[in-house]
């Protein structure tokens, strides 16, 4: 879900897929009272041999590109609209990328383009993340796309231990006997669960990956593993402050087969204010002990005034309106929350 505030009337976007009705990008111009679900052009070319199953990410472009909206799909694909999301066209430079052959299946099935991050002032620069396929950047308006996650190498002891144990049960990993793009280290991160760009410092990127939390200060050319100090290397969401204070937030999860739950039965948001050099555990107002819910990759966001909002698989939303240490549960219980978007307008 996302909100486009570039016009006088904010436009809400919601996306997904249905086994009978297919993929869609729904639009609402009346705060969600009514929706238009038509998504003309949201399909791969026939000769590609792939069918869009669902839409995982919607991202309105920056103010200097009125009308432009991007959509990321499963199977992994990028689509662009130039009429505020009314009609769509495939971005062939991504969808036919020469390294598409290395985009493997993820836990949810086919590869997924789940993250679209835009430079706040440079329309030629944007990032995309593909599940089990890496993160890519373009700096020339989409003409070419270069992988930028291949320099993210985990150094945290927790991940190294997991890798060693996994290699025992899956020998190809022990021998590094699996296909990777040319010139890419087999131990490089190819699974950024969520990548965020600091809009107040656009050279700084943050990523919660399958194997740790990483930070880049040069637009993805180099990455530092900043997992040390967290109770787990694993997790899905990551959120970045939009106020310029440099804060980032994660929700560490246990890594036990498919049982991705909060660590040690205590729901906690962890915050760093020093570029990942240290982390603070925030539990005030959050459930536990004996709490075993989880948070999906799109389940946490920040607003322009320092608010932090996190939604859970148990249907609860917790908010810190000004980024302080305490969170308050908002009224109501929803179905499992797959996306949280925080916008003040």
What kind of region is each of these model predictions?
Residues 1-345:
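Extracellular glycan-interacting surfaces
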């Amino acid at each position: 879900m996302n909100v486009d505030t570039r016009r006088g009337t904010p436009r809400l976007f919601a996306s997904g897929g249905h086994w009978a009705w297919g993929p869609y990008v729904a639009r609402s111009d009346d705060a969600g009272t009514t929706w238009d679900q038509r998504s003309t052009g949201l399909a791969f070319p026939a000769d590609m041999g792939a069918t869009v199953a669902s839409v995982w990410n919607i991202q309105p472009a920056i103010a200097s590109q009125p009308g432009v909206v991007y959509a990321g799909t499963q199977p992994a694909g990028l689509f662009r609209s130039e009429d505020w999301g009314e009609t769509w066209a495939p971005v062939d430079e991504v969808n036919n990328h020469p390294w598409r052959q290395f985009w493997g299946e993820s836990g949810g099935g086919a590869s997924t383009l789940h993250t679209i991050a835009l430079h706040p002032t440079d329309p030629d620069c944007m990032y995309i993340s593909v599940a089990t396929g890496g993160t890519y950047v373009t700096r020339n308006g989409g003409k070419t796309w270069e992988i930028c996650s291949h320099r993210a190498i985990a150094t945290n002891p927790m991940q190294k231990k997991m890798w060693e144990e996994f290699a025992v049960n899956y020998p190809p990993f022990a021998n590094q006997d699996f296909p990777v793009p040319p010139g890419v280290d087999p131990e490089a991160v190819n699974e950024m669960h969520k990548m965020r760009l600091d809009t107040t410092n656009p050279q700084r990127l943050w990523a919660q990956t399958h194997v740790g939390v990483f930070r880049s200060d040069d637009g993805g050319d180099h990455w530092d593993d900043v997992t040390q100090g967290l109770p787990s290397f694993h997790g899905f969401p990551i959120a970045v402050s939009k106020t310029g204070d440099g804060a980032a937030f994660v929700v560490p999860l246990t890594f036990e087969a498919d049982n991705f739950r909060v660590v040690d039965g205590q729901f906690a948001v962890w915050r760093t204010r020093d570029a990942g050099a240290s982390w603070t555990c925030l539990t005030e107002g959050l459930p536990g002990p004996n709490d075993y819910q989880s948070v999906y990759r799109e389940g946490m966001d920040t607003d322009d005034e320092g608010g932090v909002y996190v939604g859970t698989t148990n249907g609860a939303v917790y908010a810190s309106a000004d980024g302080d240490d305490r969170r308050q549960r908002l009224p109501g219980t929803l179905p499992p929350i797959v996306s949280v978007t925080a916008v003040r307008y």
